[in-house]
């Protein structure tokens, strides 16, 4: 940090009086300072996080979301949770008490095509992105495979998607062997249900009622 220019201002919530800080009288362009708090929180949050709410009724597993982002995630799998859910033949997904907009405050709508702006959803799955891999035998593998993907050798982008539709177009000639591309898909409850069924390889029922008297499954991080 000795070669960096840093400015930090610390003050009480709802009060404009600064308590302390470093270089806070220097004019600077604000950056993503919340990342500092994110790192601090992750270092002090322990070794598990709540991943799903669940309730077992006879041979049926009832689940609801906590917002956990790593179900079927392309980079960070959760084998213990996935094995637990797959051990049931009957699964019911309960509507979670989560109210989200697809984009956060100040998110740019035209960044919808970038992996770092995957849509927010009540139950993220696959990281809310598709993974496109050009394998060394020149075949193209798309995960998950429930969306329509069309080759278009005329387009200038490697991957293109209509803004509000899950119609994907790829130009294989621009994708090198071994390349991996992550591209956000449009989320919805129907898409979530379809992806859950595809990943867990079983039919999943939907229940509008919130899940009550549930337990919490904690996943290791």
Provide a role label for each language-model segment:
Residues 2-22:
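A short, well-structured edge-of-sheet supersecondary motif
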Residues 5-7, 33, 60:
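A common structural microfeature
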């Amino acid at each position: 940090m000795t070669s960096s220019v840093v400015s930090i201002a610390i003050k009480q919530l709802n009060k404009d009086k600064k308590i302390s800080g470093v270089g806070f009288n220097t004019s600077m362009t604000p950056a993503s300072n919340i990342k500092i708090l994110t790192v601090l929180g992750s270092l002090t949050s322990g070794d598990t996080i709540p991943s799903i709410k669940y309730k077992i009724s006879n041979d049926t597993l009832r689940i609801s979301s906590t917002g956990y982002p790593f179900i079927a995630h392309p980079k960070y799998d959760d084998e213990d949770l996935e094995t637990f859910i797959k051990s049931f033949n009957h699964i019911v997904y309960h509507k979670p008490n989560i109210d989200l907009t697809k984009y956060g405050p100040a998110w740019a709508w035209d960044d919808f095509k970038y992996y770092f702006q995957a849509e927010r959803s009540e139950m993220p799955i696959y990281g809310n992105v598709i993974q496109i891999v050009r394998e060394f035998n020149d075949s193209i593998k798309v995960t998950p495979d429930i969306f329509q993907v069309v080759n278009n050798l005329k387009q200038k982008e490697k991957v293109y998607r209509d803004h509000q539709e899950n119609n994907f177009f790829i130009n294989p000639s621009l994708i090198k062997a071994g390349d991996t591309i992550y591209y956000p898909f449009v989320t919805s409850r129907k898409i979530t249900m379809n992806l859950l069924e595809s990943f867990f390889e079983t039919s999943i029922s939907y229940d509008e009622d919130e899940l009550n008297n549930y337990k919490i499954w904690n996943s290791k991080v």
